[in-house]
Amino acid sequence: MNVLVIGRGGREHALAWKFAQSEQVEKVYVAPGNEGMRDVATPVAIDENDFDALVLFAKENNIGLTFVGPEIPLMNGIVDRFEAEGLRVFGPNKAAAVIEGSKAFTKELMKKYDIPTAAYETFTNYEEAVAYIRKIGAPIVIKADGLAAGKGVTVAMTLEEALQAVKEMLQDVKFGEASKKVVIEEFLDGQEFSLMAFVNGTTVYPMVIAQDHKRAFDGDKGPNTGGMGAYSPVPQIPESAVEVAIETVLHPTAQAMIKEGRSFTGILYAGLILTNEGPKVIEFNARFGDPETEVVLPRLDNDLVDVCNSVLDGEKLVLKWSEEAVIGVVLASKGYPEVYEKGAIIGGLDTLEDAIVFHAGTAMKRGDFVTNGGRVLFVACKAKDLQEAKDKVYKEIAKIKSDGLFYRNDIGYRAIAKVDC
């Protein structure tokens, strides 16, 4: 069987890496992929939103399964198109992908079906939004309604921050159409965690949880990013809280989507926060999280082809997980998530020994890997516990030489502090 992964980042490299381990898979293609994926897959120079070319490629190359990584093709209906062409594809259709595409839709869904989340109001009028912020005060959370590459959320700790964020979104239209409507939420305090699941209609197969680090710098300082690192397991989140989240969030959401005529098949990602009142939803995504995928898939002992086929065919599935821990660190271009330069040479990758390296934003230039995006590399290590995994990953990262990269030095600190207590 040949597999096609759609996308170009670290998440897609991790998916290709996992599919390549299957004895059922003859060849893995990634469209468009990147040069760093050639260890496990063949990059194909087709943009992830060029549906005509992707369909043609799938037909001409005997693709038995297509897995869609990023959100934008899902929102644009790639699954609907592939299914209409009789092609086997894994991911939600356009109607179901709205759970990520519109925060306003999702908040209304949770309100209607009593799924625990923060109190909120939705605004398109700038003056009304400002009046609401002044009434509620800080801390407060401002979210662009649509997709903004993980950067459309401001957790404002001061009134000034909140007013600036809403001005940028509604008046300056910082994120284009995505921020012509904003969701303003109460600030929730607690530990965040990511709970992803394979879903087909009402059938939900939860994965092990992970925690990512969204702030750019050590100590959770600096601007929000798409994620600067992740780890799994998350010992500071009790198993009982995960069970509550599965029963009060994942199952009711899958059922709610069916009732709304938007039955969901694919990866449902719940970004959650454990409050004093229990787990509450911060966000939903309609696909694997990035960078969480890069620490969860190395713990999955099942063949990913079997998992996808069982989910698509409605067959019973038992997920098997390694007891080992995984910590992964993002190496990003200096300046990310704001303005950054490309083209810095990356050396030392061939000296890494006991690490998994996923390429996110690299290119090949005259025989050298160079930086070609905001998040450039994801380096992960697996070990018997989080402390050992952390020690290993930072030892390996020190071998990478580049003037154009930076990374956080404290990925996993909350969990390791918990274990040490």
Regions inferred by a protein language model and the residue ranges of each:
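Short, charged, surface-exposed secondary-structure boundary motifs
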Residues: 38-40, 53-56, 98-104, 217-219
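Active-site "cap" helix and flanking loop/linker of ATP-utilizing ligase/carboxylase catalytic domains
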Residues: 246-268, 285-354
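Internal nucleotide-binding/catalytic subdomain
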Residues: 156-291
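Solvent-exposed alpha-helices and their adjacent loops that cap or buttress functional pockets
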Residues: 21, 36-38, 90, 112-114, ...
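Peripheral (often C-terminal) accessory segments that flank ATP-dependent C-N-forming ligase machineries
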Residues: 309-421
